[in-house]
């Protein structure tokens, strides 16, 4: 039933293909136990980012927009979160406004918690706006797992937490 096609492709299979780059085991283990507030309005991006972070041993709290991020941070005890990964473009309140709101809070960790801008906008002006809003680091989308884990490590060092 149907037609069968046979084709011959003129190439050889490499017996020693290059290994795909991934997070080094010691790198992944080094963020174990880190408490991260992940702020993302896109369900697939949230799922992928959470999978990467939890796979490396981090404890992830979710917020789906800037307003929820501000609420989650303000209702938490100071020092609860080691890092905030903040999408820049979201409904209700964008990541820049959420960051400015968090930075203006009267609590000891509001000015010091590392906040990472996550965005597909990679122009220098976008990075500058993120820094002006109070974000410390910049992570391009689509997210690369190794880069994400390295960025969280940088956050932990910035926040005074030693990597495990």
Residue locations for each model-derived region?
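C-terminal compact regulatory domains
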Residues: 1-164
